[in-house]
């Protein structure tokens, strides 16, 4: 089985395997001892675990737990130590993608082509662990997996799949996704990028500009969407080094600073006909990609939220004011309870959506509902946690302000909070409200 295969792959290649085994053994001993003491002291009524309020753990498969725990070890041991300076210096370390490729977590739901073929829930758990460290790192993985590998797998020819997917899965190639333009954000149908067909040499000439593109300054492969002369919107595979193609970096971001963000500028880029994705000829192509990415985001932001909750809780327990811990304050306890409630509901909704995805029963509106809800709630939680830390809350050494600033961007990209409200509103009423004239 592919799922079992990736578990073995993660365990055999993943750093910190000894730590993971030690942690699992220690946890088992602690749990066993705790149950013995509890049985002696109390009746057998169910106990509440605030770290897993509705027992998510029991609803995951053994492979999903194994994949999550191993990737958590990698994230905490290899990524967490470097994020502080990476964020301060606005640096994305390219080798992270190679490391993820070694772990087998790029394009993980794709079957074959060197990919793991795991469940949608496993993919969500990976996104959650990665964004627990930083949204920028999760963005890089999401783009590679959902916005680059997915369209090649779903809309590409067999030749394109064989050529690109194995290298993308290994992290040997880094990809980006070009849809947003300077004058075309929430309305991609108004894109100005054009593709002119040259019948003489069976190629397309692309002209236009894409902006706010994750990974573009370091990308080897560019999935670009352009309007053709027949009015259809098609996907094109551009390779680094093509004449007329450039990808300048966007500087001065206050969000996602550990992620490389830039533009894609195409000035007469000639693309061979075999680099056109044959299975997409409308906005349904890029929207299908975005739907996959939004699903991962819905999981990921909860990882950031959990970090903020745990940090705020520990700070409230340690910080003494007026002779007592901050956690003694009723307002603090209410805030923690609100955070825990929203995270728990979000996680279990994501679990249900993941199971539906694997049964091909997940409508795009379901994804919009959770992307909108979880991103909005995650941003609220991060802001609240920052406030609970007082003046220390604005120090990046506590990491909460970094999560809060990152989530401002995550709440906006892949469909803004309000755009997803309109998607849901259309489903509820049967009336589209994106424009006034239609």
Swiss-Prot record:
Q: What is the effect of changing residue 421 to V?
A: In GA1; impaired association of subunits
* CDD domains in UniProt: GCD (cd01151)
Report the GO molecular function annotations: fatty-acyl-CoA binding; flavin adenine dinucleotide binding; glutaryl-CoA dehydrogenase activity
Read off the transit peptide span from the entry: 1-44
Keywords, A to Z, come to:
Acetylation, Disease variant, FAD, Flavoprotein, Glutaricaciduria, Mitochondrion, Oxidoreductase, Transit peptide
Q: Where does substrate bind?
A: 138-139, 186, 287-294, 415
Q: Does the keyword Acetylation apply?
A: yes
List residues binding FAD: 177-186, 212-214, 319, 330, 387-391, 416-418, 434
**Keyword Lyase among UniProt keywords:** no
First-listed, main subcellular location of the protein, grouped into a coarse class? mitochondrion
Q: What cofactor is needed?
A: FAD
UniProt pathway: Amino-acid metabolism; lysine degradation; Amino-acid metabolism; tryptophan metabolism
Q: Outcome of mutating residue 138 to G, per the record?
A: In GA1; impaired protein stability; loss of activity
Q: Any idea where this protein resides?
A: Mitochondrion matrix
Query: Could you say which EC number(s) this protein's record lists?
Result: 1.3.8.6
Q: In UniProt terms, what is the effect of altering residue 414 to D?
A: Reduced catalytic activity
Tissue specificity annotation: Isoform Long and isoform Short are expressed in fibroblasts and liver.
Which PROSITE patterns does this one have? Answer: ACYL_COA_DH_1, ACYL_COA_DH_2
Q: What InterPro entries does the record point to?
A: Acyl-CoA_DH_CS (IPR006089), Acyl-CoA_Oxase/DH_mid-dom (IPR006091), Acyl-CoA_Oxase/DH_mid-dom_sf (IPR046373), AcylCo_DH-like_C (IPR036250), AcylCo_DH/oxidase_C (IPR009075), AcylCoA_DH/ox_N (IPR013786), AcylCoA_DH/ox_N_sf (IPR037069), AcylCoA_DH/oxidase_NM_dom_sf (IPR009100)
Tell me, which GO biological process terms does this entry list? fatty acid beta-oxidation using acyl-CoA dehydrogenase; fatty-acyl-CoA biosynthetic process; L-tryptophan metabolic process
**PANTHER family associated with the record:** GLUTARYL-COA DEHYDROGENASE, MITOCHONDRIAL
Task performed by this protein = Catalyzes the oxidative decarboxylation of glutaryl-CoA to crotonyl-CoA and CO(2) in the degradative pathway of L-lysine, L-hydroxylysine, and L-tryptophan metabolism. It uses electron transfer flavoprotein as its electron acceptor. Isoform Short is inactive.
Q: What is this protein called?
A: Glutaryl-CoA dehydrogenase, mitochondrial
Organism, per UniProt?
Homo sapiens
């Amino acid at each position: 089985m592919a799922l079992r295969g990736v578990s073995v792959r993660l365990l055999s290649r993943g750093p910190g395997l000894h730590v993971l085994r030690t942690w699992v053994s220690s946890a088992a001993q602690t749990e066993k001892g705790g149950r013995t003491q509890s049985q002696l002291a109390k009746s057998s009524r169910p106990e509440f675990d605030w770290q897993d309020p509705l027992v998510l753990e029991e609803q995951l498969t053994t492979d999903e737990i194994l994949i999550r725990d191993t990737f958590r070890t990698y994230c905490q041991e290899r990524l967490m130590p470097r994020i502080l300076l990476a964020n301060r210096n606005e640096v994305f370390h390219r080798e992270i993608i190679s490391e993820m490729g070694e772990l087998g977590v790029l394009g993980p739901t794709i079957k074959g082509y060197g990919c793991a073929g795991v469940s949608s829930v496993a993919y969500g758990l990976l996104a959650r662990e990665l964004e627990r460290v930083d949204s920028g790192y999760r963005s890089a993985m999401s783009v590679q997996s959902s916005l680059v590998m997915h369209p090649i797998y779903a809309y590409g020819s067999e030749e394109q799949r064989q050529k690109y997917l194995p290298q993308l899965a290994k992290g040997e190639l880094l990809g980006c996704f070009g849809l947003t333009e300077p004058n075309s954000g929430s309305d991609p149908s108004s894109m100005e990028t054009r593709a002119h067909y040259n019948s003489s040499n069976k190629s397309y000439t692309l002209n236009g500009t894409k902006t706010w593109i994750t990974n573009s300054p370091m990308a080897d492969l560019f999935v670009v969407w352009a309007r053709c002369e027949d009015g259809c919107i098609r996907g094109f595979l551009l390779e680094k080094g093509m004449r007329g193609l450039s990808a300048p970096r966007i500087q001065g971001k206050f969000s996602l600073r550990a992620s490389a963000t830039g533009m894609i500028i195409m000035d007469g880029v000639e693309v061979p006909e075999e680099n056109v994705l044959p299975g997409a000829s409308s906005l349904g192509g890029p929207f299908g990609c975005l739907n996959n990415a939004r699903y991962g985001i819905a999981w990921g932001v909860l990882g950031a939220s959990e970090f903020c909750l745990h940090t705020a809780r520990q700070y409230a327990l340690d910080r003494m004011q007026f002779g007592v811990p901050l956690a003694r304050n009723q307002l603090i306890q209410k805030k923690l309870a609100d955070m825990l409630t929203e995270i728990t509901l979000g996680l279990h909704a994501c679990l249900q959506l993941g199971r539906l995805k694997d049964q091909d029963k997940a409508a795009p509106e379901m994804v919009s509902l959770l992307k909108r809800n979880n991103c909005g709630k995650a941003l609220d939680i991060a802001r609240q946690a920052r406030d609970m830390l007082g003046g220390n809350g604005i120090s990046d050494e506590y990491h909460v302000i970094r999560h809060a600033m990152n989530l401002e961007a995550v709440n906006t990209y892949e469909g803004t909070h309000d755009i997803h409200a309109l998607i849901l509103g259309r489903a509820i009423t049967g009336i589209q409200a994106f424009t006034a004239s239609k």
